[in-house]
Regions:
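Membrane-proximal soluble regions of multi-pass membrane proteins
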Residues: 1-78, 232
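C-terminal ends of transmembrane helices
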Residues: 1-4, 65-70, 113-123, 166-178, ...
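Alpha-helical membrane-inserting segments
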Residues: 2, 89, 93, 97, ...
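Multi-pass membrane catalytic core of lipid/isoprenoid biosynthesis enzymes
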Residues: 47-106, 183-185, 189-190
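Functional transmembrane core segments of multi-pass inner-membrane proteins
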Residues: 102-210, 252-260
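Interfacial loop-to-transmembrane junctions
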Residues: 182-183, 217-242
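Conserved post-catalytic alpha-helical subdomain immediately downstream of the catalytic base
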Residues: 198-228
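C-terminal domain-closing interface element
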Residues: 238-260
């Protein structure tokens, strides 16, 4: 998903541009139909198809010692990290909520956020094809008030979008630069649709704090350049997941400090 879906989008945009301009594709690869299931997984370095028993999450990575069986090229650490994170998060959700409808929704929410995190980290892109269905699924879940009442979910979606939209234009008016992408607005709108408007301040504060901390540490350690933009989506996703699982407890603890 993280690697293939952006390539699928690029191929689609390329074909649309070629059709519009009347350009003939330069290679057979450009004509190849790419989907999430076809063609079968293959090494990005040598192109050799990966056998099913070499494609088992985590186990195959350890068995192959982190290298392609065909060309011995090192396999990106992103694969086992995503597999490990997905497995741990899935186990935690099932442990926390049991085999319930809420657990099912939480699992979908978790897997989508992991995918968006990986895509935005690699491509600085939050595809509408993922963020908008996530938003509508949140509203659908809250038709029956699984997480929050529907009116709070609708206000959360509107508030999530408009809050970052306002920050975007204020920053652009002051600096003449774009501080974030429209995908960030839509992701926060989706999070608001799932958890309601009450969780938006927590999500914004937590994501901004962690994002700023990571950015400062990166600059101090010289692992990133000052002028290179940093994806904000992963921090929104992380804050959103924390808010879904522990948001009520965090807000309760915060309010109790002030006797509210």
């Amino acid at each position: 998903m993280i690697l293939r879906f952006p390539e699928q989008l690029k191929n689609s945009w390329r074909r649309e541009s070629e059709d519009f301009l009347g350009v003939v594709p330069e290679s057979e690869q450009a004509k190849e139909t790419l989907s999430l299931s076809q063609p079968a997984s293959r090494c990005p370095s040598c192109g050799v198809p990966i056998k099913p028993w070499h494609n088992i999450p985590l186990i195959s990575y350890v068995f192959l010692r982190g290298k392609c069986r065909a060309c011995s090229t090192a396999i990106s650490m992103q694969y086992p990290l995503v597999e490990l994170l997905s497995g741990l998060a899935t186990a935690f959700i099932v442990y926390q909520f049991g085999l319930s409808l809420m657990a099912g929704y939480c699992l979908i929410f978790t897997w989508v956020l992991i995918s968006l995190t990986g895509i935005d980290f690699r491509e600085q892109l939050l595809p509408d094809q993922i963020t908008l269905p996530l938003l509508w699924l949140g509203l659908f879940a809250n038709l029956s008030g699984i997480f929050v009442p529907l009116n709070e979910a609708v206000i959360g979606a509107l508030g999530g979008y408009l809050s970052l939209w306002s920050v975007f234009w204020l920053f652009k008016l002051i600096t003449g630069k774009e501080g974030m992408g429209y995908g960030d607005f839509k992701l926060l709108a989706a999070l608001g649709a799932w958890m309601g408007w009450q969780m938006l301040p927590l999500i914004i504060i937590l994501s901004t704090f962690v994002g700023a901390l990571v950015g400062i540490v990166g600059l101090l350690m010289k692992t990133r350049e000052k002028q290179v933009p940093m994806a904000f989506g992963p921090f929104l996703a992380m804050a959103g997941w924390i808010a879904l699982i522990w948001g009520d407890k965090i807000l309760g603890s915060y309010l109790s400090v002030f006797g509210l």
